[in-house]
Amino acid sequence: MMQEKKSNTKVIRNEKFGGERPLFATHDLRLENVTITDGESGIKQCQNIEAYNCKFYGKYPWWHVDGAKIDNCYFALGSRSAIWYTNDLVMTNSRIDGPKFFREMKNLTLENVEITDADETFWKVDGIRIKNVKLHGGTYPFMFSQNIFVDGLESDSKYVFQYCKNVEVHNAKILTKDSFWECENVTIYDSTLDGEYLAWHSKNVRLVNCHLAGEQLLCYTEDLVLENCTIDPMCDRMFEYSTVEADIRGHIENIKNPTSGHIVADSIGSITIDENVREPNNCVIEVRNKRYEL
C-alpha cells in the first residue's frame, strides 16, 4: 500500500519486491516492513530513501543512493555487495550477514550494527563514524578508507584498517594480526589490540591507555607515540626500525633495534641491539630511574 505524506515523502508498507530494479530512480521514499526478495539492484540510482524494519535478500540492493536512513533492518547472506557508491547514509540497529558491504562511499554513519561476514567491508570510504559496531569474520575491512571515527568496536576480522588515513578509535577490542598497516595519522584510545605485526610501515601513530598483545608489534613505524600503555608479557621484538616515544606501564619483555626516540617502562626483560640496527641509533631506553643510551 502506498500513500502520500504531507512532506511529499511517499510511504510503502508491507510490500515485497523482486526481480531487477523494482525501485529504480525513486526518491523521497520511506519503506516500512518491506522485503526485497531474490533479484538484483532493488534500490538503485535513488535519492532520500528511508528503510525501517525491512529485509533484503537479493544481490546489490542499495547502489548509487544519495541520502539514506536504514533502521532495524536485516541484510541476508545473499545480499552481497549491498551498499556501494552511496553517500550520506545512516544505519542503526541493524544486522548484516552478507559480505563486501560499504564501498566507494562518502559520509557513512553506523550505530548498533552487527556484521557477521565483514569480508572486504568499508573499502574506499571517505568519512566513517561508527558507534557500538561488531565485526566478525572476513578479511581487510576498512581498506583504503579515510577520515574514520570509532567509538565502540569489537572485531575478530583479519587485517583490519590497512592503507587508511586519519583514524581515531575509542573503546575498541580488536583481535587480528596485521592491523593498521600502511596507515597515516592514527590515534587509538582505551582499546585492546591483540595480534601480531601491529601498525607496521605506518606513520604518525599514537596509542593512549591501550593494552597490546602479539609478536613483533609496532615495527617500521615512523613517529610512533605510546602513552600509559600496557604490554602483554608474551610480546617480543617490539619497535624494530621504528622512531618511537613510549611510556609503558608495567613490563615489556623485549625491545629490538629501535631507530631513535625514547622508551620508558617499569621493567624490561631484554634489549636487542645488533649489527643490523639503523642510524641514527640513538634511542634512549629507561627502566624507570635506570637509563640505557644506545
Describe the predicted segments one by one.
Residues 1-294:
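Long, distal/terminal scaffolding or interaction modules
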